[in-house]
């Protein structure tokens, strides 16, 4: 009866699949309250939970729920929605990517916010350009105006105005061309319940470099179908990107492995 009395708590965990992260201070405080009120009764009644990632499952098991109560189901993608559309056309960003003839093309897609740390992206780009002066960063995303303005100011302060190209949004049916023009996809997130952009980038055969997070934990075998690094050193990220690009055969194997991971394990049909 408890799950029906408090469906929002049960559904919240089943749907969103959170896990512990120091970044989530407000959520961590909320969890302490929920745990005190509900977890003991969930244990006694054997309430079952579905999670999006193994990190989320571990988070619940640490609350002394039994393994039988918690099942990881992952997240799927509708591959048909990402297939070719002859009338898709090109975004302005894709046109700029096509115009770049030399240098790495790095891509970030997502909200511009502290959790995704766009300032770290700029630091990585600056490090990459020490070895590859023509490298550029392409961004699709928006956020709170004040924060976006601070990121734009940092671009100027770091002297990156000529190599960072930014579009606030683009329709899903035009994303294929953007992904496929990129050499590598970056997601330096502090915390990610799953991250659909990881699935999309892998579906379009891009090598992903990201942090340990909910989606990476489920999708990526670092060095095989993508790359996972702690977000501690922009120079290390830059070296990883440059080393990956310098080995086209290995990069191609990783791109194909990324695609096969999604097709065989992470479409809704596969799940």
Language model region names:
Residues 169-170, 177-182:
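Short alpha-helical donor nucleotide-sugar binding micro-motif in glycosyltransferases
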Residues 25-49:
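Membrane-proximal helix-turn-helix segments that form the acceptor-binding/catalytic region
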Residues 149-169:
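Nucleotide-activated donor-binding/catalytic signature segment of Leloir-type glycosyltransferases, i.e.
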Residues 207-210:
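Short hydrophobic beta-strand element within catalytic cores of glycosyltransferases
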Residues 55, 76:
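Carbohydrate-associated surface elements
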Residues 222-223, 227-234, 243-248:
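Conserved acidic donor-binding segment of nucleotide-sugar-dependent glycosyltransferases
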Residues 104-127, 149, 235:
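A conserved mid-protein helix/loop that constitutes part of the nucleotide-sugar donor-binding site
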Residues 190:
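Aromatic "clamp/platform" in nucleotide-sugar-dependent glycosyltransferases that forms part
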